[in-house]
């Protein structure tokens, strides 16, 4: 059965047809609408899926935010440009005329990455470091989503009680410091206004402040991983996202994690499916690979 998989992120929308063997075809991308109003998102999704829907039998959505009974909510509304209570499943069922499933993008990515691991791995955590910081938890071979869809939102654990205010309302969240948005917000002087991609470029050129911002992000993520290990006793952690997959970043996270006491050490690896993990995980779930 062919699935039309959609990934809704803070900066881009992606869609592709995925068959039962997880082969991807006809991948398309559009920028996430700048206005992020309900009408703008609805029109962008329509333009994205219209060329693909005739060949699909169902729709699977991986989206940033919290999914509750088909509604798209946000723990940090800034990641969705203030968009709240968007009827995601209903909208796609209307556009595509197909049965539709929706799940958080990091939870979906965790499910895809779990299936790429050896069979003896039953407990793993996926962490995405991108516009925000998110995650997904697989425990004893089951994906944890939680009653309200909140499970795995690791970016909203505490990093610094004196840190910046997070979009979720807490002070000092991991996401407020370590995410691409958090790094950019902390940039000063000649780096003011730079996005995370530019900060990595400048860090590679030897810019001291840029190197500090990247290093600070990696250290915060490493400390969060130590917390995650203590809570879940996971066998491995997989890192994805545009920041998480940036050159040299995982190595820094690993080095900082090794500075933590030995009980908190855990194997780290880069996401095998990279930027397609959300699409593939959502397709797996829609094809009956249940929670």
From Swiss-Prot:
Disulfide bonds, paired cysteine numbers: none
Keywords annotated in UniProt: ATP-binding, Carbohydrate metabolism, Kinase, Metal-binding, Nucleotide-binding, Transferase, Zinc
SUPFAM superfamilies membership: Actin-like ATPase domain (SSF53067)
Molecular-function GO term, any one: zinc ion binding
Pathway: Amino-sugar metabolism; N-acetylneuraminate degradation; D-fructose 6-phosphate from N-acetylneuraminate: step 2/5
The protein's role, per its UniProt record: Catalyzes the phosphorylation of N-acetylmannosamine (ManNAc) to ManNAc-6-P.
Protein family according to the UniProt entry: Belongs to the ROK (NagC/XylR) family. NanK subfamily.
Record protein name field: N-acetylmannosamine kinase
């Amino acid at each position: 059965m062919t699935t039309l998989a959609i990934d809704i992120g803070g900066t881009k929308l992606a869609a592709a047809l995925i068959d039962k063997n997880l082969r991807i075809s006809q991948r398309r991308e559009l920028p996430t609408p700048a206005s992020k109003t309900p009408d703008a998102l609805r029109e962008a999704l329509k333009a994205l899926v219209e060329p693909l829907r005739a060949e699909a039998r169902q729709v699977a959505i991986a989206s940033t935010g919290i999914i509750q009974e088909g509604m798209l909510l946000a723990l940090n509304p800034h990641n969705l440009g203030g968009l709240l209570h968007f009827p995601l499943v209903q909208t796609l069922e209307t556009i595509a005329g197909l049965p539709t499933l929706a799940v958080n993008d990091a939870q979906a990515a965790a499910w895809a990455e779990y299936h790429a691991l050896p069979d003896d791995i039953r407990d793993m955590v996926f962490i995405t470091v991108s516009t925000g910081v998110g995650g997904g938890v697989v425990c004893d071979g089951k994906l944890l989503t939680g009653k309200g869809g909140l499970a795995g939102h690791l970016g909203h654990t505490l990093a610094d009680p004196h840190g910046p205010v997070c979009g979720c309302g807490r002070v000092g969240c991991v996401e407020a410091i370590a995410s691409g948005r958090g790094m950019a917000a902390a940039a000063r002087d000649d780096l003011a206004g730079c996005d995370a991609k530019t900060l990595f470029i400048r860090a590679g050129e030897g810019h001291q402040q840029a190197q500090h911002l990247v290093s600070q992000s990696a250290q915060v993520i490493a400390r969060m991983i130590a917390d995650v290990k203590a809570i879940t006793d996971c066998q491995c952690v997989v890192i994805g996202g545009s920041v998480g997959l940036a050159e040299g970043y995982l190595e820094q996270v690993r080095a900082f994690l090794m500075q933590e006491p030995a009980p908190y050490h855990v194997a780290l690896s880069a996401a095998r499916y990279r930027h397609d993990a959300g699409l593939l995980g959502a397709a797996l779930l829609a094809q009956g690979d249940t929670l």
